[in-house]
């Protein structure tokens, strides 16, 4: 539909469709119409639109930049110290920023003309889950050999006869200015961790080798890579269960020297310019991407091809070597990823060819060996044997090189970055270590360094990360403080502001190593949590045992009290005992009543004469007997009369007794009247003389009829 339009360049449309297969053709054609068939502008626009069709969600460049990791740039350059210009790097090859993965930091290489840039990219084990912010990023397209086996080319290979007709001719010009970078800046917001760089002491004295180490505090925010890039990833011990798709072509790439370009505008290797894909070394696996499909994306000032791990090829004016060392599994030795370095002819013929990945195609006079060993950071408690990723026998001409090394901790390391940790897990601040080459007086300051006839210099650079604190210590600290925060995926970088909407995509498309590392960290976290819960359970069990012991002691005390109460001597009497006591009490009461009645009966018979009863004293206690008081004659006579009158005969009958009692009462009344009349002048005589009780001999008042002491009647 859109290909039939006369306003569209068919070749440019074909190239864009090949690089952005996920974008509909209508969108591509509309973008071409808006940008007037400008391949550079279209690639920038389509790379921004690609994320919408990849993940159905658009991620702004700021979010993507925040999700990437921080960098360490080590610049190795053979150039005059006066030829260092921070803005020359992007003008030499128009290289693009290498985007290792979605969680990588933004790569801001130095704009240096004659330097060798080594960028240490510290990144977690994660495949790109978020589209990169660079305008040339396309995770579905990988340039030729750099294409992963998991993403086969969308179209059949084409012959590398010439560049596309729609390519900007300024791409082949040497110092052409790069396109304007996106509007995000580098933010150094991470704490510093020292990186050890060890330069071998046995450097050849006759060679012009780097002799100074310059550490720059900042790096210009440039989207595009500096001239010539060598990308090295550290080999990671990823889990064998699930490898990242990029590992297949990386493992297949053989070891060996890599062809490079010299710093001359003219073709360096004319005998290899017409190289065909069949000239690849037999050791290299023939992957379907090995044939040249389209001009290498980095040949233009605007890097529009966006392979995930794309080497920055140089422009024609300043070709430079590109060696990409992807992460290889620990089982295989680290390989130098051969990005077929395109050697260019004159700007007029735009012929592009790929150099075979063999040592025989290299000019021996322009080789330099750079050996970079990333030392594993030995952490306490974890035996980490990371396979180093040196550039073994990596010949590079004396021109600017950018070496990007990912100092990724292995997935077996428990100290992977977790958002709950208080400090940044990847505590590597952007540090730029620049090797400046002292030049002789014959070298004039120029953007392009000198070409030395026979340098075979070996740089041995040992890069090691400082030991980070073990996660076990952090877990111990969390035990003391509070409950640990939940584990977040490793792909979610701490401190990133725009990761809320895209961390799920990062986890969904993360590599096996990221999953393995996340699993290890999660297991470590869960193990620490389990230990903490076990301690709490132990304490709770001890408390339970203590409470059980207390309950048992209390029950024992209660039982003892019950036993003491049951065995008490003052027990409640039984009903039988109460009945017996009640009957005894009743019998006593009856006996008392009978005695009283008997006494009353005896009193009614007159004065009781103990002498008349022989056995009277046999029934009472013996005691002193008081003799009767002597009274007057008349009184004695009256008493005798009363005794006679009140004498009761036991043998008399009842009527006789009643008559005698009445007569005795009349006599008594008469005697009382007589006594009162006789004793009236005195109180004593008026009341009468006190009388003695016959039983107890108590002297009672004359008005009383009964004794006060023994209650016996006065007259018996």
From Swiss-Prot:
Q: Which residues carry this modification: Phosphothreonine?
A: 408
Coiled-coil intervals in this record? 521-564
Q: Where is the composition biased (Low complexity)?
A: 233-246, 269-290, 409-421
Pfam families attached here? CUE
Recorded hits in CDD domains, A to Z, give: CUE_TAB2_TAB3
Give the GO cellular component terms, alphabetically. Answer: endoplasmic reticulum
Compositional bias (Polar residues) at which positions? 163-173, 375-408
PROSITE patterns of this UniProt entry?
CUE, ZF_RANBP2_1, ZF_RANBP2_2
Task: Identify the keywords attached in UniProt to this record, alphabetized.
Answer: Acetylation, Coiled coil, Metal-binding, Phosphoprotein, Ubl conjugation, Zinc, Zinc-finger
Biological-process GO terms, alphabetical: defense response to bacterium; non-canonical NF-kappaB signal transduction; positive regulation of canonical NF-kappaB signal transduction
Q: Which InterPro entries match?
A: CUE, TAB2/3_CUE, Znf_RanBP2, Znf_RanBP2_sf
GO MF, one term, reads: molecular adaptor activity
Q: Which residues carry this modification: N-acetylalanine?
A: 2
What is the recorded post-translational modification? Ubiquitinated; following IL1 stimulation or TRAF6 overexpression. Ubiquitinated by AMFR via 'Lys-27'-linked polyubiquitination; leading to TAK1/MAP3K7 activation. Degraded in a lysosome-dependent manner following interaction with TRIM38.
Residues in CUE domain copies: 8-51
**Free-text function comment from the UniProt entry:** Adapter required to activate the JNK and NF-kappa-B signaling pathways through the specific recognition of 'Lys-63'-linked polyubiquitin chains by its RanBP2-type zinc finger (NZF). Acts as an adapter linking MAP3K7/TAK1 and TRAF6 to 'Lys-63'-linked polyubiquitin chains.
Q: What is known of its domains?
A: The RanBP2-type zinc finger (NZF) mediates binding to two consecutive 'Lys-63'-linked ubiquitins.
* Record PANTHER family: TGF-BETA-ACTIVATED KINASE 1 AND MAP3K7-BINDING PROTEIN 3, TGF-BETA-ACTIVATED KINASE 1 AND MAP3K7-BINDING PROTEIN TAB
Protein name per Swiss-Prot or TrEMBL: TGF-beta-activated kinase 1 and MAP3K7-binding protein 3
Organism field:
Mus musculus
């Amino acid at each position: 539909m859109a290909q039939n339009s006369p306003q569209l360049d068919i070749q440019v449309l074909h190239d864009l469709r090949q690089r952005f297969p996920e974008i509909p053709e209508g969108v591509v054609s509309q973008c071409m119409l808006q940008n007037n068939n400008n391949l550079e502008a279209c690639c920038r626009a389509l790379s921004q639109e690609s994320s919408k069709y990849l993940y159905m969600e658009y991620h702004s460049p700021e979010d993507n930049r925040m999700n990437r990791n921080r960098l360490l740039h080590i610049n190795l350059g053979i150039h005059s110290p006066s030829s260092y210009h921070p803005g020359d790097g992007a003008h030499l090859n128009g290289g693009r920023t290498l985007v290792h993965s979605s969680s990588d930091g933004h790569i801001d290489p130095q704009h240096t003309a004659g330097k060798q840039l080594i960028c240490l990219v510290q990144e977690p084990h994660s495949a790109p889950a978020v589209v990169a912010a660079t305008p040339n990023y396309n995770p579905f397209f990988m340039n030729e050999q750099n294409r992963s086996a998991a993403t086969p080319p969308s179209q059949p290979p084409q012959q590398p006869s010439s560049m596309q007709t729609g390519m900007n001719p300024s791409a082949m010009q040497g110092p052409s200015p790069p396109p304007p970078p996106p509007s995000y800046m580098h933010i150094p917001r991470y704490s510093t961790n020292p990186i050890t760089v060890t330069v071998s002491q046995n450097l050849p004295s006759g060679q012009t080798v780097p002799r100074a180490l310059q550490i720059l505090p900042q790096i210009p925010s440039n989207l595009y890579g500096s001239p010539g890039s060598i990308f090295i990833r550290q080999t990671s011990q990823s889990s064998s269960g699930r490898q990242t798709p990029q590992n297949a072509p990386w493992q297949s790439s053989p070891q060996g020297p890599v062809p490079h370009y010299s710093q001359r505008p003219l073709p360096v290797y004319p005998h290899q310019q017409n190289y065909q894909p069949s000239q690849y070394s037999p050791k290299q696996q023939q992957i379907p991407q090995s044939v040249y499909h389209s001009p290498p994306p980095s040949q233009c000032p605007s890097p529009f091809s966006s392979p995930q791990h794309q080497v920055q090829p140089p422009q024609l004016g300043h070709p430079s070597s590109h060696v990409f060392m992807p992460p290889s599994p620990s089982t295989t030795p680290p390989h130098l990823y051969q990005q077929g370095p395109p050697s260019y002819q004159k700007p007029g013929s735009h012929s592009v060819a790929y150099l075979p990945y063999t040592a025989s195609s290299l000019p021996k006079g322009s080789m330099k060996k750079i050996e970079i060993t990333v030392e594993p950071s030995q952490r306490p408690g974890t035996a980490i044997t990371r396979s180093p990723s040196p550039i073994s026998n990596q010949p590079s001409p004396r021109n600017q090189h950018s070496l990007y090394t990912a100092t990724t901790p292995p997935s077996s390391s428990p100290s992977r970055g977790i958002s709950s940790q208080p400090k940044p897990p990847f505590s590597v601040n952007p540090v730029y270590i620049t090797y400046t080459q002292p030049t002789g007086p014959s070298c004039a300051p120029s953007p392009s360094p000198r070409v030395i006839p026979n340098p075979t210099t070996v740089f041995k650079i040992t890069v090691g990360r400082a030991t980070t604190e073990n996660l076990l210590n952090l877990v111990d600290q969390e035990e003391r403080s509070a409950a640990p925060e939940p584990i977040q995926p490793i792909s979610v970088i701490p401190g990133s502001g725009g990761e809320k909407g895209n961390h799920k995509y990062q986890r969904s498309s993360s590599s096996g190593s990221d999953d393995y590392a996340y699993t290890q960290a999660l297991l470590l976290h869960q193990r620490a949590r389990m230990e903490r819960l076990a301690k709490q359970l132990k304490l709770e069990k001890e408390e339970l045992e203590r409470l059980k012991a207390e309950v048992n002691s209390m029950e024992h005390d209660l039982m003892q009290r019950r036993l003491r109460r049951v065995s008490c001597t003052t027990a409640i009497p039984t009903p039988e005992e109460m009945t017996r006591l009640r009957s005894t009490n009743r019998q006593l009461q009856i006996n008392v009543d009978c005695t009283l009645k008997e006494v009353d009966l005896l009193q009614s018979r007159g004065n009781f004469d103990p002498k008349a009863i022989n056995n009277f004293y046999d029934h009472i206690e013996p005691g002193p007997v008081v003799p009767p008081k002597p009274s007057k004659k008349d009184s004695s006579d009256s008493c005798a009369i009363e005794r006679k009158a009140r004498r009761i005969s036991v043998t008399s009958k009842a009527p006789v007794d009643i008559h005698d009692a009445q007569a005795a009462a009349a006599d008594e009344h008469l005697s009382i009247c007589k006594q009162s009349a006789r004793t009236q002048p005195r109180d004593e005589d008026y009341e009468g003389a006190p009388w003695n009780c016959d039983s107890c001999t108590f002297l009672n008042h004359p008005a009383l009829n009964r004794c006060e002491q023994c209650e016996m009647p006065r007259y018996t």
